[in-house]
Each structure stands twice: as structure tokens, then as C-alpha cells.
Amino acid sequence: DPVAPTVLIFPPAADQVATGTVTIVCVANKYFPDVTVTWEVDGTTQTTGIENSKTPQNSADCTYNLSSTLTLTSTQYNSHKEYTCKVTQGTTSVVQSFNRGDC
């Protein structure tokens, strides 16, 4: 049976923004079958600066874990507000997002 992922998004730390390069991390845990990760910035789908890393299938429950990072310059990051990670599995999507400056 399909297992929906638990999705978490992690905004960059303020001291990372100061370095000039920002990474935003999206994690999808314990899912089956496979998923697709889409990044959106202010509603626009991103196609560059994305790196996905998937763990091998868990032998106990046959699920996967995936980590996806979106890398931007601090200038790019500061010029946008809403950052969204969308994890799609078949016809179902789990969406997590944050607004820059909320915390």
C-alpha cells in the first residue's frame, strides 16, 4: 500500500544568508512508492540549483527517505518571499512552505 511522506522544510539560518550562498532543505520521510520534488519561489517553479538525495529502500518497511536542497545566492533569496517544497506521489501532493522574514 502507498505510504504518504512526512514533509519538512528548513529555512536557511541568518548567518548562512550573510555568507552569500543560501541552501533551503526539504525532507520527505518514510514514503512509498517514489515521489517527485518540486521547488517554487513566489509561485514560480525552479529548475536550477536543486540537488536530490534519496536513501535506499528501508528493508523493514520498504519506505524511502529523500532530502532535496535548493541553493540560491543571498541576493536571490532576499529578493523573494515565499519558498515552497512540493512532494508529489501519484495524484497526491504534500506541500510545505515558509515566508522569508517570518522568524
From Swiss-Prot:
Coiled-coil stretches noted in the UniProt entry, renumbered to this chain: none
Key word Disulfide bond present: yes
Disulfide bond annotation, renumbered to this chain: C26-C85
Record flagged with keyword Transcription regulation: no
Domain of life: Eukaryota
Pfam families xref list: C1-set
InterPro entries: Ig-like_dom, Ig-like_dom_sf, Ig-like_fold, Ig_C1-set, Immune_Resp_Modulators
Other remarks in the entry: This chain was obtained from antibody to the specific carbohydrate of group C Streptococci and was isolated from the serum of a single rabbit.
Record-given protein name: Ig kappa-b4 chain C region
Organism: Oryctolagus cuniculus
Taxon lineage: Eukaryota, Metazoa, Chordata, Craniata, Vertebrata
